[in-house]
Amino acid sequence: MKLLSVLITFLLATVIYSQTNPATLTFTVQVYDQFPGYNNNFQTNGAGARVTGLIKSTLNSTTRVPELVSTATGGLNGVGLILNPSLFPYFFSPQQDSSLPGQNSPLSLDLVFTYDTTRNIYVYNNQNFFPIDNQGLDVDPAKRIYLNGATYHNYHFCMKMNTVFTYKGYEVFNFQGDDDVWVFINNKLVIDLGGVHGPLAASVDATTLGLTIGNSYNFDLFFCERQTVGSTIKIETNLLFVCPFEDYCGVCQGDGSSCCNPLTTCNDNNQCTIDSCPPANTTIGSGSISDYCIHTPKINTNPIDICFNYQCNSSTGNFDPIPIPCLDRSSECLSTIGCNSTVGCQYESICNSNVCNIQNQCSSNGTCVPKSSNDCGIELDGQVDKCKIYSCDSNGGVGCIKEDKCKPSEDKCHVVSCDSLTGSCITTPLEDPLAGLHLCSIARCNSSTGEFTYDPIICTPSSNPCISTQCNATNGQCYETQIPGDICDCGCGIPENKCKVSWCTPEGICQPKFKSEIDDNNSCTLDSCDPCTGIISHMTAPQCLSCNQCSN
């Protein structure tokens, strides 16, 4: 069984100017209910002892709560049964978030001091000091598991008292107690009874602290009950405490946590705010404390991204990325293809998807510029060919195409060509491949096939039957020649005399004459012709029968 008995004696000087002291004084202090399941520095069940030097000798002037000298386990902390140094800050500071270690429940407690007229001191004496039974965390029956025999009490809590007194020059105080008790005057540690231990006593003579009469000094008392099973407290004081301010919970220099829980009192159901209680010195006027809560917007800790704005999700508290809309640049023929976190919005020309548009070129009215025939000419040939017709076919991504301006004639006997300087179409007859070889023939072209045939030139006959007309193969001209009379058929034959033929004179007169072959021009023959049969005979002349020396 553990006995908690704290005896702190604050000797009060007689009130100056014979002021009558009230019969009772009520001082509201801050209490932090603890539960061993949340903070294992409580109910360690170890063999404790008084340990000095656990906390720093100078009080933190900002937080005004003690700080451990070391955060290491073991050593002095182990002797003082501080098994988990990381949770020590929650001995005297609020931690109301159940999702985090070290949860406690802040409460306020009124200590009522009674004036002892015989000794001119105020006394608080409670030999069964269980001020927060069934309160704080122990509102949950499952937490009421620590007993003294069959009797339940709340054995795990810490208390702090932060106030100010004006030094008169004669103050002293004495106390007796068990478990952690630390007292600071002027932010200096003057009582050091750390650890889990039995009742111990200590005294402080304020006249030995180098204080100046008339000056005001901080007085800070810290007390913890950390283990079952007994608890007593007795306080006697003649110090004239002055409370610089009370928090809105009524606690002297309190932090507001005894009546304000940021997770419940100040919960605005918006996960995008950090809810906190009002500053401790806030004056609560009309309305409730929750009307004065502070709701600080959460700060986005995501790296800056020029493609996204981060917006807090009020349901989750997470910062969701919201894409930043890219500018509409359709008037520049540009479409968005996404955003790059380094350079921002990316665009591409809508004109580039059509092969018949000039790449990356947009008109002033926001439409793509189509390729002209000249553009296609330059693209295909390096320059415009006047003998070509250029166009662009977007179907199937074909792009620029060209065709001859001058189309072949349907008449195969004519050739269509183009003047490269003017682009004019010129039609010329198909050239005879045998031209010059058949001057006495007329070449004829088949318009369906383009093939040539050749008809001979017919020269006009002469009216003179003794004149022949014919074509000159060297120049293709018709010319006349005289037909020898003996072969000229004048049409005046003598049928009754078969030894004669027609003879045509140069004048064209028909005169019959003997056939020329009757005369063989041999003087040794006698030439004759049978007029009836036309048989020619050549008999030897008589004069040539003997000599055979006839001359021709």
UniProtKB/Swiss-Prot annotation:
InterPro entries per the UniProt record, alphabetical: Fibro_Slime (IPR011874), PA14/GLEYA (IPR037524), PA14_dom (IPR011658), Prespore-cell_inducing_factor (IPR051154), S_mold_repeat (IPR001673)
Protein origin, superkingdom: Eukaryota
Disulfide cysteine pairs (residue numbers): none
Leader sequence segment: 1-18
Domain PA14, residue spans: 114-255
Keywords from the named record: Glycoprotein, Secreted, Signal
Glycosylation sites: 60, 281, 313, 340, 365, 446, 472, 521
One Gene Ontology CC term in the entry: extracellular region
Compartments, record wording: Secreted
Stated family: Belongs to the prespore-cell-inducing factor family.
NCBIfam families (alphabetical): Fibro_Slime
PANTHER family (UniProt xref): PROTEIN PSIB-RELATED, PROTEIN PSIB-RELATED-RELATED
Protein name: Protein psiB
Source organism per UniProt: Dictyostelium discoideum (Social amoeba)
